[in-house]
Structure formats: structure tokens, C-alpha cells
Curated annotation (Swiss-Prot):
Gene: kdpC
Protein localization: Cell membrane
Keywords, in A-Z order: ATP-binding, Cell membrane, Ion transport, Membrane, Nucleotide-binding, Potassium, Potassium transport, Transmembrane, Transmembrane helix, Transport
Name listed for the protein in its UniProt record: Potassium-transporting ATPase KdpC subunit
InterPro entries, alphabetized: KdpC
Length: 194
């Protein structure tokens, strides 16, 4: 009996010690460092409106359906963050072809003046997460004609807006040149109010 207690005692102490270290101490230290070093990222990269209300995150895409605004990538999960993921069909899968064709048909309805051959692939395909907040600058530019027509904002002004909102690759190495759709639409909204 004494032998069982002598074996059990260190096991319980080690378990409790690691429970406190890994479940309490480590998360508090990491959270503290994140808040000190990169507060915006640690808080979710939230975007606020003029009334200081949270309207979204730079990291999570939103579904813009109003034709006066720039549209982001297609989402198979309807931009529901709790269901992050995508079907990730293989290029040979007929379901992928059907979904892309459906996206192209939607595109043609809203942008009849833009040839389908000019539609960037990121406007008709899903991202891996289904929540991608960014599109390529070209994907933003092909929407300029529609937006200009509906908002009466000159095309040149919209093109400059896209350039102003374009971000380069992270550290000049990782990823591609991109435009955050939410931030772009917020700037567009300011132009529409003028």
C-alpha cells in the first residue's frame, strides 16, 4: 500500500504542476507578450466605424452583395467563421467545375461589360479557409467599371483607391500583393458620402 502511494504521489504532483504551467502560466505569459508587442493582432485586428463600433476584422472576410461595393472571394461556408474550411475539390472533380461555372454566371450578371476571360481566378474560386479577406489588385480593378457606373465615382478615383489600399507581400517575401476588401469598401463608403 505504501508503495502505491509513493508512486502515485509524484504522478499527481507532476500532473498538477503541468496543469498549472501549461493551462495558466504559459497562456498568461503569451497573452501578456502579445498585448505588449502586437496589441492590434492580439485583439483580433478589429476594424471600427466612426461610432467606435466593431464592424469586422482585417483577418476575416465578409460577404458583400451590394453591387456598389467591391466583392471578395467566393465562400463555400457563407463567411461563417465557426465553420471555417472549404470543400477543396480536386481540379478533376466535376463538382468544382459546376461551382466555378455558377460563380462565373453570377459574375456575368453583375458585370456584363467585363469579358469572362478577364475575371481573375480568385473571384470565382474558394480560398482554403473560406474566409479570405483579401483579393488581388486585378480582382478589385475588374470591378471598377460596375462600381463607377452605380456610384458615379470616376474610374480613375476608384483605381487610385485600390492602389492606396494595396498591400505588398509580408516582409517582401510571403504571400502576394493583395487588397483587403473590407478596408477598401470602408474607403469607398467615405467617397460615396462626399
Amino acid at each position: 500500500m505504501a508503495k502505491k502511494q509513493s508512486i502515485l504521489s509524484p504522478i499527481i504532483r507532476i500532473t498538477f504542476t503541468f496543469l498549472v504551467l501549461c493551462g495558466l502560466v504559459y497562456p498568461l505569459i503569451v497573452t501578456g507578450i502579445a498585448q505588449a508587442v502586437m496589441k492590434d493582432n492580439a485583439d483580433g485586428s478589429l476594424i471600427y466605424n466612426d461610432k467606435n463600433e466593431v464592424i469586422g476584422s482585417k483577418l476575416i472576410g465578409q460577404n458583400f452583395t451590394d453591387p456598389r461595393y467591391f466583392h471578395g472571394r467566393v465562400s463555400s461556408i457563407e463567411y461563417k467563421a465557426e465553420a471555417s474550411g472549404s470543400n477543396n475539390y480536386a481540379p478533376s472533380n466535376p463538382d468544382l467545375e459546376k461551382r466555378v461555372e455558377k460563380s462565373i454566371e453570377e459574375w456575368k450578371k453583375q458585370n456584363p461589360s467585363v469579358p469572362v476571360t478577364e475575371v481573375p481566378i480568385d473571384l470565382v474560386t474558394n480560398s482554403g479557409s473560406g474566409l479570405d479577406p483579401d483579393i488581388s489588385p486585378k480582382a478589385a480593378s475588374v470591378q471598377v467599371e460596375r462600381i463607377s457606373k452605380l456610384t458615379k465615382i470616376p474610374k480613375e478615383t476608384l483605381e487610385q483607391l485600390i492602389k492606396d489600399q494595396t498591400e505588398g507581400a509580408a516582409l517582401g517575401l510571403f504571400g502576394e500583393t493583395r487588397v483587403n476588401v473590407l478596408k477598401l469598401n470602408l474607403e469607398l463608403q467615405k467617397l460615396m458620402k462626399q
